[in-house]
UniProtKB/Swiss-Prot annotation:
Role this protein plays: Cleaved by the protease thrombin to yield monomers which, together with fibrinogen alpha (FGA) and fibrinogen gamma (FGG), polymerize to form an insoluble fibrin matrix. Fibrin has a major function in hemostasis as one of the primary components of blood clots. In addition, functions during the early stages of wound repair to stabilize the lesion and guide cell migration during re-epithelialization. Was originally thought to be essential for platelet aggregation, based on in vitro studies using anticoagulated blood.
Organism: Ceratotherium simum (White rhinoceros)
Record key words, sorted: Adaptive immunity, Blood coagulation, Coiled coil, Disulfide bond, Hemostasis, Immunity, Innate immunity, Secreted
Primary subcellular site in the record, as a coarse category: secreted
Origin superkingdom: Eukaryota
The organism's taxonomic lineage, starting at the top: Eukaryota, Metazoa, Chordata, Craniata, Vertebrata
Domain comment (free text): A long coiled coil structure formed by 3 polypeptide chains connects the central nodule to the C-terminal domains (distal nodules). The long C-terminal ends of the alpha chains fold back, contributing a fourth strand to the coiled coil structure.
Subcellular location: Secreted
Chain's gene name: FGB
GO biological process, one term: innate immune response
Protein known as: Fibrinogen beta chain
Cystine connections: none
Gene Ontology cellular-component terms listed: extracellular region
Length: 10
């Protein structure tokens, strides 16, 4: 899956 949320959480 795409960790778009994780990228936004940086």
């Amino acid at each position: 899956h795409d960790d778009k949320a994780a990228v936004d959480a940086r």
